[in-house]
From Swiss-Prot:
Ca(2+) 2 binds at residues 345, 357, 404, 406. Residues 135-313 form the SMP-LTD domain. It is found in: Endoplasmic reticulum membrane; Cell membrane. Changing residue 663 to A: Abolishes location at the cell membrane. This is Extended synaptotagmin-1. The modification Phosphotyrosine is found at residue 1009. The gene is ESYT1.
Amino acid sequence: MERSPGEGPSPSPMDQPSAPSDPTDQPPAAHAKPDPGSGGQPAGPGAAGEALAVLTSFGRRLLVLIPVYLAGAVGLSVGFVLFGLALYLGWRRVRDEKERSLRAARQLLDDEEQLTAKTLYMSHRELPAWVSFPDVEKAEWLNKIVAQVWPFLGQYMEKLLAETVAPAVRGSNPHLQTFTFTRVELGEKPLRIIGVKVHPGQRKEQILLDLNISYVGDVQIDVEVKKYFCKAGVKGMQLHGVLRVILEPLIGDLPFVGAVSMFFIRRPTLDINWTGMTNLLDIPGLSSLSDTMIMDSIAAFLVLPNRLLVPLVPDLQDVAQLRSPLPRGIIRIHLLAARGLSSKDKYVKGLIEGKSDPYALVRLGTQTFCSRVIDEELNPQWGETYEVMVHEVPGQEIEVEVFDKDPDKDDFLGRMKLDVGKVLQASVLDDWFPLQGGQGQVHLRLEWLSLLSDAEKLEQVLQWNWGVSSRPDPPSAAILVVYLDRAQDLPLKKGNKEPNPMVQLSIQDVTQESKAVYSTNCPVWEEAFRFFLQDPQSQELDVQVKDDSRALTLGALTLPLARLLTAPELILDQWFQLSSSGPNSRLYMKLVMRILYLDSSEICFPTVPGCPGAWDVDSENPQRGSSVDAPPRPCHTTPDSQFGTEHVLRIHVLEAQDLIAKDRFLGGLVKGKSDPYVKLKLAGRSFRSHVVREDLNPRWNEVFEVIVTSVPGQELEVEVFDKDLDKDDFLGRCKVRLTTVLNSGFLDEWLTLEDVPSGRLHLRLERLTPRPTAAELEEVLQVNSLIQTQKSAELAAALLSIYMERAEDLPLRKGTKHLSPYATLTVGDSSHKTKTISQTSAPVWDESASFLIRKPHTESLELQVRGEGTGVLGSLSLPLSELLVADQLCLDRWFTLSSGQGQVLLRAQLGILVSQHSGVEAHSHSYSHSSSSLSEEPELSGGPPHITSSAPELRQRLTHVDSPLEAPAGPLGQVKLTLWYYSEERKLVSIVHGCRSLRQNGRDPPDPYVSLLLLPDKNRGTKRRTSQKKRTLSPEFNERFEWELPLDEAQRRKLDVSVKSNSSFMSRERELLGKVQLDLAETDLSQGVARWYDLMDNKDKGSS
């Protein structure tokens, strides 16, 4: 066959290549052979393209060398060059991975069926949903519709961004006034729906669709801020996830659907290919951070429990409830343990294999919990409980991931997933679940809690929860959903300006906030908030309407949740009048409470057999008109979870330095000093130290105690003032966060005084946690006497917590009229009054009170029940010594009032306050180290008694004083004294602890007291005396006395100690029970001594 000049040999049909399907598949012109007919000269366009490619390559390499040259020119280290090179390589790797992922995803979507046939042996997760799950259907017809609409959707997006979003961005910040969208293209690759699954829904008036969507688009959106020559944008994006669409409610008019709700059941996966300045987000580290932030933003409005609601008809009812419906149920997740975990810790470069430090992450939707870390354990025991709200069944999954805690990056140990539908079917699921991606198993107990719309079983649930040990939080008995709708006629700001109202809703220590609605006093929020409740009978909902600055309060509302328990179906849907607001200011809310009930045959609610009055029903005289049985009378109280969780904060105000001088004399010509004192404020209490005259470096050494709770946000406020005749001058202030002390347990710091040129304050703060054991009480009393200062009140040895629940069978007025009773609780000089319950003989108070106890052996709780406007209905005196011998130092039962009519149900709980920084905690181990006789004198710390470094000496002293090897008391008894010289304050200190085995001369025991006299002086200036104890042979005093004198003078003195008793009520004569005289020259006062001394008669007064 004749060929034209320039043609090569004709290829055979078998060798004939198919025509490329895409123009980009054509070989480049630069690589084509020259046409022979053209004289062997290359084509012009091909040569120009090759030259341009060479120049471009050379320019790029030159640009890479420019930063290296600049680094050398300015003298930077080669490390900066290497660091920049590492950043570039990391960025390049992330970019290549994203582009490779985009190409693979586009190839999959372009020919899904062919690729599916080729990849049948690929992993299950790479297959489309319609292959993986037989009940998921293909929806090609829907994809064709989306592809047809896609260009018009792009036009709408371009218009929306240019006309709505861009002006909003320009108005948000002055620096963005030149912000504009330069390019908005959704591209030619539309969103694809891989599979569709239809559910019938919970109710007949709704339809559920699960759309398995996959978007691998060539979208390109570019923005520019012309003022700063800044360009950024997106070029390519991937989004994969399951989108649930709910058509609800179905109605009888067009369009037959009232609204469409959309949300992702689980977090979708997102991958964005950035351009321009946003290329920096592809740097390793920033890439994961930016993707996480974007996913958090998407989850905030489009991942359960959040959803997007699109109403299709006007005036749709219950829009807020459609946007935030009630949960389907609650799952209580008990994370118990794990076993057989893999070991990730390696030592000596991997030669020695260690264990792991495992912790677990528990997720359900956007709800995430983290367990504590168990160090060095492959079979950890967590024993933690979490409660999660389940909104959609089926669909949501419980996910547990186990990690090994490391200083740098935590190692993955495995994960497990479980559909919540299986928990719903089983009600209680307790099993070991294998970990995927690792080795080992995790032990979970999963309980499905149903939501009940009546309070019939609330007492049963509370009784069960009371016996359940749960951490980190107590189990919940109910949930509360608050639908915040709108407010009316809120007060205006100063200058009659419209406020920007927002709402804070709080239950105990949980606070949630609404969005702010700007420039209106009639805001509409339409938001929902959810709370877990431990005891709905006693908790309250606190609502604060504020301006968005949080400084101006527009109104407040406190709503006891007990009101909901009597409302129909536990729902309140109404207007609420606001206090501290305008006369017509009100708030519209819908409150829905649901009781959490575990309906399982495994659960047996405990009862107390033999409880007196548990079923106190008068069968002979039933009440007429009652169709239900009388409720059982509870045997024990049911306080809320916060009862008994208080701490005591012990505040040592020690000294200050470099205070400013405020005193002036002669019209300011002569500069004096200051007379400083300290004021403290915490938890609604205030304290004040004594005044130190004329001193810029004062020492107070005072101790204050206050009962505190772990409510966040509390601060100890400390202010220093100069005492003056007219107005006290300010010397500075400082603050300490209470959570810092509660978490650490101890804080000893010099705090810089604020708002003044100079000055600092030395504080020592200690958290005392009550312990339910009396084993350490004696040591606590002794240590308190040692650290007691002369200017401070007596330190507390225990904390008494009282929970007043109710009373029954109180006496009536003349006839059958009920009283309005209330109760008063008194311990020492502290008292608490409960609220008044009107017109009842069986009041329910549900109140608690706490008291500081200084001498638990002698103090008592005095309770009186009174009627408003009448006298005492009954009283009760409870000696605290009964609590000291009770189990766990607690009494929880019915007490009969002294009047004989009426009973009260209360819980009295005592906790011993043991200081962790005085050495008392080690006393239980001290007997094994004590072998010295009574004649040996253990050393005492010569420093001030509050210094924590004296703990070993203090522990040694307690060991010898209370040693069981001590000699028996003499015929007249013994007195226990502690003596030392406090060198920093130049004081001789003596503590009279008590006496034992005193002599009884008459028929009745004596009323002893101790008198101390510093000889040779016999005047009132050196005489000290304890309080008097009634009718006892072993009195306890624990009282401290001080004498100001130099050490050398103290060593020349003698201390005369006399134990006396009043002989009769009418006589001034004192009976001497015994005495002892101590020669201080023979005592090492700098080290100190503490011991028992035998009492002698008046003829033989020498020390022994």
